[in-house]
Each structure stands twice: as structure tokens, then as C-alpha cells.
Amino acid sequence: MAKKVVKTVKLQIPAGKANPAPPVGPALGQAQVNIPSFCSQFNETTKDQMGFVIPVIISVYEDRTFTFVTKTPPASDLLKKAAKIESGSANASQTKVATITHKQVEEIANLKLPDLNAYCVEKACKIIEGTARNMGILVKD
């Protein structure tokens, strides 16, 4: 018989840097999960993605065990890295802060494809271009 999921926790944690401090500790402490065990497993799983914030979905079962699934980094983080900027524009419609190529958008779309609501790379590129536009990043051909 399958274990019953008691709680699902969604967090965004820097890759390889999970520790019992907030936000990880309080979120998992409420679910009575072994926090050091989660931190070590998460850090081991994400050590090759250092520098990115990784979304994670943690399923907590009634016997206090857990499983977690990591997702790809947020599109905004990938776009900021590609454009070599710290943050997007405060007024994206009038102020453009950077320019990236369509090839860079395609690389990001290929990376994000499993987590996007799209079945082909062309549609995924449109989603990423929309995110870039909202951040004040110009996409050139």
C-alpha cells in the first residue's frame, strides 16, 4: 500500500547551499521532517548546478519520511545569467537593460522545456521571450 502524503512543501533554494536556517528549517520543521537529512540530500543532488536557485517540491508522508523533486532554475535567473545583469528593468516597457540573441533564448528554452507548458522548442522560445520582454531584455535575431 502506498504511503499517504501529509504535506507538500514548495521552496526555492540556492543549489548546494541548503541549511536548516530559514526558509528551509521552518517550512520542514512544521512538517516534522528530518531537516539535516533533507539538506544533505538536496545539496548532493544539486551540487552541479551551483550559482542557481533551484525550485524543489517536497512530499512529506505520514511516517515523517519525504521525497523531493527538483525543477530547472527559474527562467528569469537563466536570462539574467545570459544577459550578464544583476536584475531586470524596473520599467520594462520603456527601459531596456540588456540584449540577448535568439540562440541564447533557444538554449534556455531547451533547458526549461521539461518544466514549461509547451511541447516544442518554438513555443518554449516564445514563453522565454515573453519573460525576457517583461524583464526589459531585448531579444535580437
Curated annotation (Swiss-Prot):
GO CC annotation terms, alphabetical: cytosolic large ribosomal subunit
Gene Ontology process terms (BP): translation
Molecular-function annotations in GO: large ribosomal subunit rRNA binding; structural constituent of ribosome
Record SUPFAM superfamilies: Ribosomal L11/L12e N-terminal domain, Ribosomal protein L11, C-terminal domain
Entry superkingdom: Bacteria
Record flagged with keyword Cell membrane: no
Entry PTM: One or more lysine residues are methylated.
Keywords: Methylation, Ribonucleoprotein, Ribosomal protein, RNA-binding, rRNA-binding
Transport is among the record's keywords: no
Function: Forms part of the ribosomal stalk which helps the ribosome interact with GTP-bound translation factors.
UniProt record similarity statement: Belongs to the universal ribosomal protein uL11 family.
PANTHER family per UniProt: 60S RIBOSOMAL PROTEIN L12, LARGE RIBOSOMAL SUBUNIT PROTEIN UL11M
Oligomeric form and interacting partners: Part of the ribosomal stalk of the 50S ribosomal subunit. Interacts with L10 and the large rRNA to form the base of the stalk. L10 forms an elongated spine to which L12 dimers bind in a sequential fashion forming a multimeric L10(L12)X complex.
Protein name, UniProt field: Large ribosomal subunit protein uL11
Organism of provenance: Onion yellows phytoplasma (strain OY-M)
